[in-house]
Amino acid sequence: MRVVDCVGALIRDEQHRVYVQRRTAERRLFPGIWDIVGGHLEPGETPEQALVREVEEETGWKVRDIVWSVADWEWEYEGRVRRELDYLITVDGDLSRPRLEAGKHDASAWVGPDDLELLMVNRTDGDLRLRDLVAHAVRTRFTDRLRLEPITGPNGVLPGQVADLVSVYADPWVATWYDAAAWTPDDVARQAAGYQAGWERDSVSKWIAYEGGALAGRGGLSRVSAESPVAAAITDLVGAEWAVDRLELGWALVESARGRGLAGEIGRAGLDFAFNTLGARAVIALTERVNTASQAVMQRIGMTYAGEITAEGWAEGMKEIRPDAPFAVYITGPQA
């Protein structure tokens, strides 16, 4: 593998926004585009040392914590290939007053979920890789024990989570509940693409969950299609306020991650995202009546039993999925 040429700093604030700055129009490399903090390694520097130096030179801030190594990728400009490492970090300093490096940057901004297209301004080549990298950092969440990354397919910077999603659905317990035993890697890849499309279309979708370096499962939020029978049944049960956002919360953990409270961490992260990032009015979770373990998690994270609907799933005493299985529905609002 090539030696590391440059580093990038995905500086994130308490609102999960990422700091970007605009390169001056006079710059030879990528003039006029919005970029993250970063630059080339100097002789003898490690990537981490270069990161600390670049952050202070370009913003005046001090690196507090290198949270996570997000990406290791290569890009080409004017025939030269460069290897870049990008890190999610936090900093100390006045985040409202960065010290822009004279002659190099002329504006700054904090990018949240609704601001991602700023990364495409003046980007005449249509290259989405930096935009997608920032989106990944903005959408990632951390709990006490988990890192929750938005599920995507390969996107030119990140490898995506298809292989890990295949492992989740290969777990016998997960495969049973999701009727996934016969799914192929191509089936799972299509599902990952669907999750990625959900992030772009709905500003929310599923995460893949890691405990340290170990795969724990997947979970998060989905917007239930307004045209689906399930949406109509839920609306009839819980009321029209839920139908404004149509958010459903769920999780699926591999065997090594079950029974240790991790589903609750995913659930609470999903509720926080729904209410504090999206401004949602209500969130539901539903599972088959026979899945008492998931219902217990719903109760522990503060959701209230609302009643039952019928949908395709498992029912007590049945050996096959049926179209009218009873599902327990739980609901909560932002003040719950």
Write out the residue ranges for each language-model feature:
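A structural microfeature
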Residues: V20, W68-A71, G217, G307
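Acidic pyrophosphate-coordinating catalytic loop
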Residues: R2, E26-L29, D72-L85, E316-R322
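Acyl-donor (CoA/ACP) binding surface of acyl/acetyltransferases
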Residues: R139-T176, K206, Y210-A336
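Conserved GNAT-fold acetyl-CoA-binding loop/helix
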Residues: W173-G194, S205-W207
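Unchanged
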Residues: L41-D65, W73-D125
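Conserved N-terminal beta-strand and adjoining loop/helix that marks the start
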Residues: M1-V18, G213
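Conserved Nudix-box catalytic region and its N-terminal flanking loop in Nudix hydrolases
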Residues: R17-E57
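Charged phosphate-binding loop/patch that engages nucleotide di/tri-phosphates or the phosphate backbone
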Residues: D125-R139
